Amino acid sequence: MTTQQTVKVQLVRSPIGTKESHRATVRGLGLRKLNSISELQDTPAVRGMINKISYLVKVL
């Protein structure tokens, strides 16, 4: 079994008042409440999602 690289993301700003697609991206990353943390596989798709909403999240 190979170990995948992971990345932890924390929601640090509320998605209220942002574009609907940005809110959907937040939900797609598994983030719900403010300061919630999600551990995800480090793939180009996930990196693109993080880049899209970089003003809402912090990479730990």
Swiss-Prot record:
It comes from the Bacteria. Transmembrane segments: none annotated. The keyword Ribonucleoprotein applies. Keywords: Ribonucleoprotein, Ribosomal protein. GO terms for molecular function: structural constituent of ribosome. One of its GO terms (biological process) is translation. SUPFAM superfamilies: Ribosomal protein L30p/L7e. Part of the 50S ribosomal subunit. Belongs to the universal ribosomal protein uL30 family. This is Large ribosomal subunit protein uL30. It comes from Delftia acidovorans (strain DSM 14801 / SPH-1).
